[in-house]
Amino acid sequence: MSRTIALKPEQVPVDSKPTLDAFTKNIGFTPNMMAAFAQSPLAFNAWATLLGSMSKALDVKTRDSIGLAVSEVNGCNYCLGVHSFTAEHMAKLSADDIILARKGHATEPKRDAAVQFAHKVIETRGQVSDADLKTVRDAGYTDANIMEIIALVAMYSLTNFFNNVFDHEKDFPAVTPAGSI
């Protein structure tokens, strides 16, 4: 049961309305998470700006794989449903690739290095080793790319924490519990 309300269209603060309307138009419906997040125009619009900027980072398969890995570590079932859906339908990842990403890996070596690094960042709270940095650099990522990976980890963690705190009603397909994959 949700611990906050998902706003109805007439309840959305005026400063959140353009952002929420754009998401609704783009997605085709208003996810409960966004309808709740819109209660705070400052937080909602800041997150939306970060999301817009980070949608240009790396490639969609890598971004979605990182989202899956981070959401798995953070135990966010809402976000795992969202990222599993987008990974399948937008990034065109196979079911096996989605499970692998949730475990912090990928089939393609360069993407695997990014996902493993993101997994290390979230597990160690950023206290990665020199060897971790060397591995991701050796895979072909620049320091700018590594900063983007870190920003993606932070962005996905924000929505993980938001959804874990407020426990929104799921409006994306449920995923298999992590213990059984």
Segments (PLM) and residue ranges:
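Hydrophobic alpha-helical segments
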Residues: M1-I181
